[in-house]
Amino acid sequence: MSDVQFLINVMYPAANAAYSIMSVPTPPLALPPGFALVGPISADPLRAAPAMAIAAPSQQHIANAMVAESSIFGLVAWNAVDKTAIVAIRGTKTIWEWIADVDAVPVPYLPDLGAGLVHMGFQVVYEHIRSSIQGLLKTGCAGALRILVTGHSLGGAVAVLCGYDIAKNFGLGVAPELYTFAGPRAGAPDFTASFSKLIPKCTRVVNFMDVVPQVPLPPAYEHVGIELLVHGGFRPLDVTYAHHLTTYLNGLQKLPASVGVPPLSPPSIPVPSQIPTSQP
């Protein structure tokens, strides 16, 4: 399986399932091959209350928009053969529910105050689900050799905050790998530097003409990892089309399938290492 196939066959289905699981009743989840559901990532407003209390109303709105759609923010899945866990975090149904509030003053990252500054609204969202993710990983993914973290849109930014926390504080003994789709910038340059020291593998898939990865604006905010640019399509009269997760899949499918054939570790799930990239 090449790097592009890994994104299409493993990470895209995981990111898509993070949306599917919020439906009632939940349809059969199309998880990546070999993975079984550990459980849904559930929001806990009580645990997020301290962060909500100090957040500006506009930043509280970002979390409230997520909760209003569903208390389920994604899922954790487990491949028992390869000892690989997936954490997948959803965004909102439309970007208009939060993007107007994306311009926020960065604040200290609560799970590690020395790590730097992050987006206030994205942090409030993460505080809603931090304990749920930690519990699912510890109870359902014991002995993990590999942890893959993904998310689309707002979920991509929250995945960045989650990935750092897993590496720094969860005590699982493995640095997660991040593969996000259409994620906005999550932190300031100091957080990006701290993130890079802990997370050696982070690929951000970005579709040409998608506005969401362009916000919040630099220099106050800076992207983490390496950007993989795809051309999934856009429509001049529909700004959101370029942001759809299915549009991203279309862009990935246009890339050469033979790009980057890395060694397997663990067996049967490749380690992407040679994805063609452009710097953010």
Model-based region annotation:
Residues 1-150, 154-280:
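Non-catalytic, mobile gating and regulatory segments of ester bond hydrolases
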